[in-house]
Amino acid sequence: MSGAEVVRMKLDHRKSSRCSIAGRWGTVLIMALATLLLGNPVPLATAEDEAQVQESARLIAVLLDSGRVAIGRNQDLINDPARGDKGFTPEVFAEQMIALFKERTGHDLRNLSTAQVPALAKPLLERLLEESKKTVATYQTVINVPGLKYKGLIPATFGTETGARFQLWSGIYLKQTAPEGLLRNPKNKPDAFESAALHKMEDPSFPRNGEQIVSEVVDGGKSVRVLLPLFYGKACLSCHGAPRGERDVTGYAREGAQEGTLGGAISVKLPLP
């Protein structure tokens, strides 16, 4: 065998070895990726999981709205310029909020540990109640100033500020929103999902009684979104009713709304397990 043939044989052997090594490493990498992607698959959320998360989101929305309603019912007291100390403390407010929530859901927040609500909801409802009290606490000084006709604490400001406090603590998406034609606060501008849901709620056939919601699983099955509609009641019309365009106590133009029409919604987004 010539020297040239020997050299060619050695080179062929080295190439074969490199290919063999590369092949083995390629197989190892493929197996590793398969194990990573398929070996421990994330289980899909069950229908029961979805129902529990949806109910938790609904309860959060109802609780925030219960606080809004409590604030709305106390507007004459809060804005009474003839009185100093109104006695509308965070504790008094919380009792009213708890009572309204129980009336609407049957659940007593004072006995939440034994309440028949999803486990996920319990700490979140407790915290939302605390953040609601904090919002009212920040207004105590101005509420009790005599001679001032408008104190700034209305259902809308309560909802926006409390939602922001709760979201800062929990990372959970919670906000008020409204159709763009009724929007007063740009922070509450609806996203695409909210706009579509609000459009459904504006339809006269959408139920006005009970706690009917619009819900959808989003993010490829990773989250649940819930919208709770807010329909105008009689008390709302002092700011949002006729005559359209006239300034209300807050300085905004009235929308000319009628009782029972859609005023907005509370939007919640929770992750699925």
PLM segments and residue spans:
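N-terminal secretory signal peptides that target proteins for export/translocation
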Residues: 1-22
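Intrinsic-disorder/low-complexity coil detector
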Residues: 12, 40-42, 242
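Contiguous N-terminal and early-domain "leader" segments and peripheral loops that mark the onset or edge
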Residues: 18-19, 34, 42-47
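Bacterial N-terminal signal peptides
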Residues: 28-39
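Extracytoplasmic c-type cytochrome modules immediately beyond a signal peptide or single-pass transmembrane anchor
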Residues: 43-231, 245-273
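The canonical Cys-X-X-Cys-His
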Residues: 232-244
